[in-house]
Amino acid sequence: MTASIEEIRQKISDEQFEFSKHAVDQSISRNILVREVRESIANGQIIEDYPDDKYGASCLISGLTEDKRPIHVHCSYPTRPLIKIITLYEPSLQRWNDDFTQRISN
């Protein structure tokens, strides 16, 4: 099974999500607002899929905020009652391509 961006967007829109402690800490230290998480998911795409992640199936979403800030959101599949936001960050051009959708091989 793979995650559906439409299902994730719907759950985010319906307030059916929660942040892990790690994601809360990262959002504070990286100055990423909940509004920006919502915007990046609404405008984003799934760029990596982790169906066998040790804590449960998850995926990585890359999207832009309304201010065009790139944000990556690692979250659980929408099969859970609440989507878990696992971590989030602003991707770096040192590790990602120009549109932040593919990792750069070293």
Sequence positions of predicted segments:
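Ribonuclease/tRNase effector modules and their secretory precursors
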Residues: M1-N106
